Every structure is written in structure tokens, then in C-alpha cells.
Amino acid sequence: MKSLLLLTTLLVPLHLGMAWSAKYAVDCPEHCDKTECRSSLRCKRTVLDDCGCCQVCAAGPGETCYRTVSGMDGVKCGPGLKCHFYSEEDDFGDEFGICKDCPYGTFGMECKETCNCQSGICDRVTGRCLDFPFFQYAAAKSPSRTSASHTERDSASGDGNAVREEIGEGNAARPSVMKWLNPR
């Protein structure tokens, strides 16, 4: 009797360990058979099902996603997206949410990878560093603020002294009709 209790005590943790490594998937086959998988050619993007056997259609941005489902299309978020779960459950008692973009600085499946780019911005799917040449070009071509020459008549934003001087001298004539400027 003691040996049966000892054997049970040793085998139960082993069985639970295998269940935890399957990511809570249900009805997974013992061995993956790709011929049993449905075609995913019509999908925009695919992900592995919870069993890790078949490619299934992935949910896109703004689409509904579920926490634990195996072999079902459109219920896991695709790469570069993460499921943001609601506090309530659906009619069947399953947790669900909406697929949203990975936060900046993360990428990949469920946004688990960290971006190692100098700018801190990378492609949310692949992790490839993103460059923004239009910002670099504009910064290289813009004149230095310190090299601009200023005259006594230049006024800063909100400084109306130069305008008051012109009005006081009588140099500024105002038209009696409102003038409309054409947009650029």
C-alpha cells in the first residue's frame, strides 16, 4: 500500500508538468500530424494553434481574441498584436478581449520580445529597427537657430511693440474693408 502511495505521489507531478507545458490546450494529439491540419491559405496571417501543431488564421487588430483555444481560426492574435482581455467572460465562460498593437519597444507574438534598436522603435511584427529618413533629412537641412540675423524691427510672438510704433508714427494705413487671405 505504501509503495502505491509513493508511486502515485511521484507520477502526479510529472503528469501535471506535461499539462502545464501544453499552454492549457485541450484535445492535443500525442504526435502532430500536419495532414490533419486545415488549410490556412485564405488567411491574411497565421499563428500556431495552442498545441503547436497546425497553422491557424490569426485575429487582426480590433478583432476578438480568446485566452485558451486549440485548433480554432481567428481566436489568437497575430504577430505584433496582443490580446487585451476584458474582466467579464462570454456566454460559454471563456475569457475574451480585443487584439491591439504591441506597445512601442516590444514586438513578436504576444509582444514578448524587446526591441533593441537605438531609436527604441522597431517593426512590431519582425523586430527590425525602423529609420525615419525624413526627420534626419529635415534636421540636416534646417538652418541653425543661432545663425539667423535679427533686426530691431523683428518681433517675437506676442510682442506688439514694433506694430504700436508704426501706428504711432502714422506709417501704417489700415484698409476699411476686411481683407481675406487665400490659403496656401
Swiss-Prot record:
Positions annotated as glycosylated: 157
Compartments, record wording: Secreted
Keywords from the UniProt entry: Angiogenesis, Disulfide bond, Glycoprotein, Proteoglycan, Secreted, Signal
Any matching Pfam family: IGFBP
A single cellular component GO annotation: extracellular region
BP GO terms, sorted: positive regulation of cell population proliferation; positive regulation of hepatocyte growth factor receptor signaling pathway; sprouting angiogenesis
Record-linked InterPro entries: ESM1, Growth_fac_rcpt_cys_sf, IGFBP-like
GO molecular function annotation: hepatocyte growth factor receptor binding; integrin binding
PTM characteristics: O-glycosylated; contains chondroitin sulfate and dermatan sulfate.
Protein's name according to its UniProt entry: Endothelial cell-specific molecule 1
Alphabetized PROSITE patterns for the sequence: IGFBP_N_2
Disordered, as annotated region: 145-184
Entry keyword annotation includes Heme: no
Disulfide bonds: 28-51, 32-53, 37-54, 43-57, 65-83, 77-99
General function of this protein: Involved in angiogenesis; promotes angiogenic sprouting. May have potent implications in lung endothelial cell-leukocyte interactions.
Main location: secreted
Region forming the signal peptide: 1-21
Every IGFBP N-terminal domain range: 24-102
Biased composition (Basic and acidic residues): 150-167
